[in-house]
Amino acid sequence: MKLQVLDIKGNEIKEIALNDYVWGIEPHQQAIYDTVISQQAALRQGTKKVKTRAEVSGGGRKPWKQKGTGRARQGSIRAPQWKGGGVTFGPTPDINYKKSVNKKVRALAFRSVLSLKVKENNLVIVDKFEFAKPSTKEMVVVMKNLKIDDQKTLIVTKEKEELVVKSSNNITGVKTISANQLNVFDLLNATKLLITEEAAIAVEEVYA
């Protein structure tokens, strides 16, 4: 497929030929879902923790003698059946929330989301960004020129460009990453994908 490449003033300057296998497939919803769940699960931390009977304070003495009281035998007042006792099989912080997704499914999810951006006219390709210094004001002007200033936008450059990152940091709804940091969740979370020509080629080389 061929798509227009714009300059930062919003002018069409040339066409770029992109691989239909990466940018023009029918989106696979299940692959997208599985990949996002896997990505989100990997971010979870084990923060739940309860004390076992060995960790609860007290309960070192046998509450009453073994025989002769008529009551059930008890070894500790911190056994699980007692109020204030330890918890049996409770949550621990070392739980593993990770959900694995194989490489083929993950790659299919990437191609699906990229194709979805093209299909919905939410992909904008620019030749390059030109900033002499970090400037939020200039970035706002660029986004207005590209007619995406009121959209939640993911900006992707081939490599990390400090001037672009610093120029966009203070703009609400805008996130800037490099091509090797691209992920399905960020792509889905943004309405518009603003990507440089170099970054688009780099992404295509990975998933073609």
From Swiss-Prot:
Pfam families: Ribosomal_L4. The keyword rRNA-binding applies. Keywords: Ribonucleoprotein, Ribosomal protein, RNA-binding, rRNA-binding. GO terms for molecular function: rRNA binding; structural constituent of ribosome. Disulfide bonds: none annotated. One of the primary rRNA binding proteins, this protein initially binds near the 5'-end of the 23S rRNA. It is important during the early stages of 50S assembly. It makes multiple contacts with different domains of the 23S rRNA in the assembled 50S subunit and ribosome. Forms part of the polypeptide exit tunnel. This is Large ribosomal subunit protein uL4. It comes from Mycoplasma mycoides subsp. mycoides SC (strain CCUG 32753 / NCTC 10114 / PG1). The gene is rplD.
